[in-house]
Curated annotation (Swiss-Prot):
Gene: rpsC
HAMAP family: Ribosomal_uS3_B (MF_01309_B)
Name of protein: Small ribosomal subunit protein uS3
Entry keyword set: Ribonucleoprotein, Ribosomal protein, RNA-binding, rRNA-binding
Species this protein is from: Desulfitobacterium hafniense (strain DSM 10664 / DCB-2)
Superkingdom of source: Bacteria
Length: 219
């Protein structure tokens, strides 16, 4: 089962938290569509900043949007002008009071979504898919990843018949629920058609905090 399902969704509520944190009774559908619109808008507008994920929190008529970015300087802009413009656009889109929070991604090489997008960009620039995969795997392992697997599917190298090729290093235990595995997907639009890129990165195990037994007598 771990081989088939999205590793992020499988671990939500176990070692991962939700990316949308709010509760809705009757207007769930509208808020869900609003979330999708906000995420799509932010990803498109801040393409150069490297945005792997957008977290959304809601309370009454307020929305808090946390944008994770590899290049936070591009998001903030000179003197915070860009982030203020973004906030106003999001307020106009949602009709609610919006607070924007920027979080820096310290190691982009260990973020599966950014890695997948990087490989897709290289494929669009006609870099050999084997070379792109191999170099990316080496970079991730150098940055402290414990395992990585990259899969490319489509008309690789302009071949007549589409196929899937993958490259991996280290270990990626997809069945282990306490394993911190990040997953990312991106598409490369080449002259021969789309090439799908999937990336799994294993960062180590997340062990539950041990409960310290309280000693009687205040010791």
């Amino acid at each position: 089962m771990g081989q088939k399902v999205n590793p992020k969704g499988l671990r939500v509520g176990i070692i991962r938290d939700w990316e949308g944190r709010w509760f809705a009774d009757k207007n769930y559908l509208e808020l869900l569509h609003e979330d999708l619109k906000v995420r799509k808008f932010v990803k498109t507008k801040l393409q150069q900043a490297g945005v792997p994920k957008v977290e959304i929190e809601r309370a009454a008529n307020r929305v808090k949007v946390s944008i994770y970015a590899a290049k936070p300087g591009i998001v903030i802009g000179r003197g915070g002008t860009e982030v203020e413009n973004l906030r106003k656009q999001l307020e106009a889109m949602t009709g609610k009071q919006v607070a924007v929070n920027i979080v820096e991604v310290k190691k982009p090489e260990l973020d599966a979504q950014l890695v997948a997008e990087s490989v897709a960009q290289q494929l669009e620039k006609r870099v050999s898919f084997r070379r792109a995969m191999k170099q990316t795997v080496q970079r991730t392992m150098r940055q402290g990843g414990q395992g990585i697997k990259i899969s490319c599917s489509g008309r690789l190298g302009g071949a007549e018949i589409a196929r899937t090729e993958w490259y991996s290093e280290g270990k990626v235990p997809l069945h282990t629920l306490r394993a911190d595995i990040d997953y990312g997907f991106a598409e490369a639009n080449t002259t021969y058609g789309k090439i799908g890129v999937k990336v799994w990165i294993y960062k180590g195990e997340v062990l539950p905090a041990k409960k310290v037994a309280q000693v009687e007598g205040g010791k």
